[in-house]
């Protein structure tokens, strides 16, 4: 989903979209250990202020000792994109990381890259989500599973994941794991309940 909250003139749109992409890529590469579930970017109507809100499972890693890491991110982003714009970075803690598809995907990637058997990883991820209160979860892994010659797709679903119901709160994430055998694609669908 798009997590950019701003409008612009037609001619400025590509540049602002590229700025958003630069911000997201930089923050994700700089702070992989912080467990970032989403990055929201909003701008005011005159494009004079950029507000970046980072939702993190481990905000203390993102902020760093005495705010050092966050200050480094701020200064680099200021040089890269802010041409006269005021940049504000907010960090919000994700209270339940096991109910975020993005973080579940990161956990699966981390385990698969450590060469843990894929079926065990999927079952563990599903169990963690169900304990956290998810009503349903579906996880799919595709590629050379356990180093097999022929690539295949495997998935496990527990509970219900209604993808056709509009009021269903379904969180989705797509990840890639770079293993010694090649690239594995991971998809996570997490059903948190219905929005009334």
Predicted regions and their residues:
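RNA-contacting regions in translation and RNA-metabolism proteins
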Residues: 1-196
């Amino acid at each position: 989903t798009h997590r950019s909250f701003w409008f612009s003139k037609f001619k400025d749109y590509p540049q602002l979209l590229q700025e958003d992409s630069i911000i997201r890529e930089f923050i994700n590469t700089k702070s992989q250990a912080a467990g970032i579930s989403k990055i929201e970017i909003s701008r005011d109507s005159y494009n004079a202020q950029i507000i970046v809100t980072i939702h993190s499972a481990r905000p203390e890693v993102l902020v760093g000792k005495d705010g050092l890491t966050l200050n480094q991110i701020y200064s680099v982003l200021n040089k890269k994109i802010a041409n006269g714009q005021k940049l504000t970075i907010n960090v919000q803690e994700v209270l339940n990381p096991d109910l975020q598809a993005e973080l579940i995907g990161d956990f699966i990637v981390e385990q698969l890259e450590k060469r843990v058997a894929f079926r065990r990883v999927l079952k563990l991820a599903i169990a963690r989500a169900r304990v956290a209160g998810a009503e349903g979860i579906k996880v799919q892994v595709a590629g050379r599973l356990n180093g097999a010659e022929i690539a295949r797709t495997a998935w496990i679903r527990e509970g219900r994941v209604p993808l056709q119901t509009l009021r269903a709160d379904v969180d989705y994430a797509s990840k890639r794991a770079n293993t010694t055998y090649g690239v594995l694609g991971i998809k996570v669908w997490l059903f948190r309940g219905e929005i009334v």
